[in-house]
Amino acid sequence: KKQRRVAYAASFASFIKQASSHEDEFLPWLKLFDSVSVREQDGVEYVKSKGINCELTLDPTILLDKEDYEPICAERKIKDKYVLMFGWNTNTDLVEAAKMVSARLGLPVYNIVPPPRKMFCGIPRRLDVGPCEFLSMIKNAEFVVTNSFHGTAFSTTFEKPFVSVVTGKADTRMYSLLDQLGLSDHLVTKDQINIDKMLVTDFSCVRERKSALRKTSLNFLQNSLKGL
């Protein structure tokens, strides 16, 4: 019996341009799927250009509200107010942006990005951060400075003031997510950061947009799994 194959919220991340040089390897397998959705708009367009139906859906972590995550957040370990720096890599722009926010708010910065040592560029790094601590660090931050998709996603989930710092080639998932949520102005270079504007983000509008996007994403899943 043929098994149903569903790809939910897959992603090309920042590698959409490289996909064309590997089509012989992955397209035959992709065509075996009954339903396909991805997280970025240019990914939707690319997959559709290959004759495969594709929809734009939310990352699965965004299908939940902050109330769903709060029970698994670790106990707060940093009692004072702080700025959080988190990214998928460490670069000068991210560090400078974090220090800029720190100076503006008069708060210390804590770092949970590589490399794994206690201090990096004068910023202390938390070495005791697993998934539950990660959620807690974002939830309790006064401001989040990130260049990571999931740093961005969870900042919107916990409705924190944040900035997603772009350096060269950005993750297209971040572009698509923030565009859908009406937060494109949070994706900037370090020289474009408007801290005062980020501090007064209207998350009520973001909640409304998320609610509609969740319905679309859940409809995709329900339709894809119908009859099983």
Question: Which sequence ranges carry the predicted segments?
Answer:
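Active-site anion-handling motifs in enzyme catalytic cores
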Residues: 1-228
